[in-house]
């Protein structure tokens, strides 16, 4: 009986210690911002940006290369968690940019520009890579023409940040094809994780 009583006390002590450790971890997670525990049981502060925000930031960075004077758009095509193509809106390679000679507006649209999604898909075509089963991250909701190109190319999911003249027919086509559509907002926390100041090597 004494042996059984000793084992029972030992088990109770271990159970108490484990629960106490869990409580300590919970308290620490609140105090120091710990958000996860790794495979070795070590508490970590998760400072890595999530994949959707990462890919969308890549698209936003590309948008800064745009030569359109009305709207800067960037896009990246992702397959199996890897970027396989990218593009931004601008004039045909080797021809004047809108930033140099102005927009060429016809029926409310600039016909000089090649859209970001189109440039990304054409980059895939030039490299001989299929877009089938990939997803795209684009800064703005695709126009109806780009939507048709994306669907025809086999894109399985369209991710975007901002609504921009969302075309009802484009939305209906996406739904008819069973393609996933998701708005991926970028938060101030996401943006704050990218500290470019530490990479500055020269002061202008």
Feature names for model-found ranges:
Residues 26-204:
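Zinc-dependent deaminase catalytic domain
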Residues 7, 12, 20-22, 38:
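Intrinsic-disorder-associated, low-complexity terminal segments enriched in Asp/Asn/His/Tyr and depleted
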Residues 1, 22-25:
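Compositionally biased, low-complexity segments
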